């Protein structure tokens, strides 16, 4: 990545900044137990996390997305998640070091997510990131979510930083499309919730990494004449 006088780094939340899948998996397992069913293979749920609650309950219960049984299960999932959205979620290995490096470099950071604010805020607070993050943009704050550029443009506006001075990091094509259309630099991460049929190499990101610590090197290169 060429030098870009970076001023801010924005993260997608699920599958990029945080591994929130353990809470999703625990809830779907509890739901199956409540419905008299045995545990499901965790990977079935993890593979479709990026598809949201509907995709996760469909996978957990072996249903098609258009099954009439999915909607009541989705609502049950969301009700349970409201009470247990910040129990097992953790930052990915290497994220604490990355955030420390961002702050040490004098940059600011924030989160742009498609997760509703009623879930996103408690998670950020519980993990101690609410005070450190300078912006949190959720679907509640915009008329169009990612892949539309509106959430990224709102975050940049709230920070008072031109999008060209921002790096947006995500684990889904919609993240890269949103960042690119907003005018930010983009980084795709392979460690997140990527569907087995997806290939980040085809997304058009400025850089692709396999581990959060690699992003420290990306920032170093972006901030120097190397």
UniProtKB/Swiss-Prot annotation:
Catalytic activity: N-acetyl-D-muramate 6-phosphate + H2O = N-acetyl-D-muramate + phosphate
Protein known as: N-acetylmuramic acid 6-phosphate phosphatase
Cofactor or coenzyme needed: Mg(2+)
Coiled-coil ranges (or none): none
Disruption phenotype: Deletion of this gene increases ampC expression and promotes beta-lactam resistance similar to other peptidoglycan recycling mutants. This mutant strain is hypersensitive to the antibiotic fosfomycin which targets MurA activity and thus blocks the conversion of UDP-GlcNAc into UDP-MurNAc as part of the de novo peptidoglycan precursor synthesis pathway.
Chain positions recorded as Mg(2+) binding sites: 12, 14, 171
Record key words, sorted: Antibiotic resistance, Carbohydrate metabolism, Cell shape, Cell wall biogenesis/degradation, Hydrolase, Magnesium, Metal-binding, Peptidoglycan synthesis
Signal peptide (from-to): none
SUPFAM superfamilies per the UniProt record, alphabetical: HAD-like
Active-site residue numbers: 12 (nucleophile), 14 (proton donor)
Similarity field: Belongs to the HAD-like hydrolase superfamily. CbbY/CbbZ/Gph/YieH family. Phosphatase MupP subfamily.
Keyword NAD: no
Any single biological process term in GO: peptidoglycan turnover
Entry annotated with the keyword Transcription: no
Job of this protein: Specifically catalyzes the dephosphorylation of N-acetylmuramate 6-phosphate (MurNAc-6P) to MurNac. Is involved in peptidoglycan recycling as part of a cell wall recycling pathway that bypasses de novo biosynthesis of the peptidoglycan precursor UDP-MurNAc. Plays a role in intrinsic resistance to fosfomycin, which targets the de novo synthesis of UDP-MurNAc.
Species assigned in the record: Pseudomonas aeruginosa (strain ATCC 15692 / DSM 22644 / CIP 104116 / JCM 14847 / LMG 12228 / 1C / PRS 101 / PAO1)
Upper taxonomic lineage: Bacteria, Pseudomonadati, Pseudomonadota, Gammaproteobacteria, Pseudomonadales
């Amino acid at each position: 990545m060429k030098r870009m006088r970076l001023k801010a780094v924005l993260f997608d939340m699920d599958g990029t900044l945080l591994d929130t899948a353990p809470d999703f998996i625990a809830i779907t397992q509890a739901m199956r137990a409540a419905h008299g069913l045995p545990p499901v293979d965790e990977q079935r749920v993890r593979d479709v996390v990026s598809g949201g609650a509907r995709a996760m309950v469909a996978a957990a219960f072996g249903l098609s997305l258009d099954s009439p049984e999915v909607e009541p299960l989705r609502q049950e999932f969301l009700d349970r998640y409201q009470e247990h959205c910040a129990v097992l979620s953790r930052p990915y290995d290497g994220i604490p070091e990355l955030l420390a490096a961002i702050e040490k470099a004098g940059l600011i950071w924030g989160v742009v997510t498609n997760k509703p604010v009623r879930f996103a805020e408690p998670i950020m607070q519980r993990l101690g990131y609410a005070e450190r993050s300078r912006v949190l943009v959720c679907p509640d704050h915009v008329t169009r979510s990612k892949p539309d550029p509106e959430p990224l443009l709102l975050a940049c506006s709230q920070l008072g930083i031109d999008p060209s001075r921002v790096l947006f990091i995500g684990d889904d094509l919609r993240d890269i499309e949103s960042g690119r259309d907003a005018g930010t630099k983009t980084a795709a991460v392979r460690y997140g919730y990527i569907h087995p049929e997806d290939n980040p190499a085809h997304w058009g990101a400025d850089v692709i990494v396999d581990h959060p610590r690699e992003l420290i090197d990306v920032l170093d290169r972006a901030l120097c004449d190397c």
